[in-house]
Amino acid sequence: MFKGFTSILVFSAGLAMAQKSPVSSVRLYVFDCGNLKSGNPQPLLDRGVTITDMSVAAYLVVHPRGTLLWDSGVIPDDLIKPGGTTEARATVFKTLKSQLAEIGYQPSDITYLALSHNHYDHSANSNQFAGSTWLVQRKERDAMFPATPPQNPNPNNARFSALKDSKTVVLDGDHDVFGDGSVMIISTPGHTPGHQSLLVTLPKTGPVLLSGDLYHYPSERTLKDFTPFGNLGDPQTEAASKAKVEALLKEKKAELWIQHDILAFGKLKKSPAYYE
């Protein structure tokens, strides 16, 4: 199931720092990075989506061999004010950095950074982790840092610009992060050229798959031809990725955590509590 090739590019940024505190087994922390209002809810309501607002999450995997931060929020920490900040359709009350600090970590303690994809609601604080080793699909990195930069770049791209010089592991498929099969990056292109999801096998909770934006709402798993944001990517490639993940969920008897599912996200325990 896990196939692909990995190559390593070493840039000028320093090596990632060692993990903060050794652990004997894998832990998964869930960070609340705010919520998003739907910009066009009616088509979603017409297809049976009852709540169109979306949660925004980031996750910290703590492994005996290091740490992995998965996604980095929707509004940069330095813009978050006491009482919360709203930017466009996003509202955030807690900084990512403060949630890390609450469990004893700072950005320099993060061994690896992996983004499900480059969109603004998953990458806002990426520059804080430029000293970590960045795990990214080749096609995603090429889209983020094209050989010929666009004349009118998205201003949100500045929020991950420091990753260009990070120590980088460039992926061409699935990737075993720590070498023991417990934390697997799963290549799921379609929503973006190098979109990826994350399978974490926890000793007590069991296997959990973090969706990224492969799914936004649970309805997508049962409604045919329902890709609410298909205009952003390649629907046919995304459909193949969904089939791959559904087969993987069945094979591993894994639980799917849809990162934007605001109802399911509300039921998850948040850091400083953790799953193990």
Segments (PLM) and residue ranges:
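Bacterial N-terminal signal peptides that target proteins for export
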Residues: 1-6
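Histidine-centered catalytic micro-motifs
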Residues: 113-123, 188-195, 258-262
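Active-site metal-binding motif and surrounding structural segment of the metallo-beta-lactamase
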Residues: 81-136
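Cap/insert and terminal regions of metallo-dependent hydrolase folds
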Residues: 76, 88-98, 199, 204-276
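Metallo-beta-lactamase
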Residues: 20-25, 91-109, 137-187, 234-253
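Hydrophobic h-region of N-terminal signal peptides that target proteins for export
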Residues: 9-18
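Conserved beta-strand hairpin/beta-sheet module of binuclear metal-dependent hydrolase folds
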Residues: 34-98, 197-215
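Active-site metal-binding loops of divalent metal-dependent hydrolases
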Residues: 33-34, 72-74, 118, 139, ...
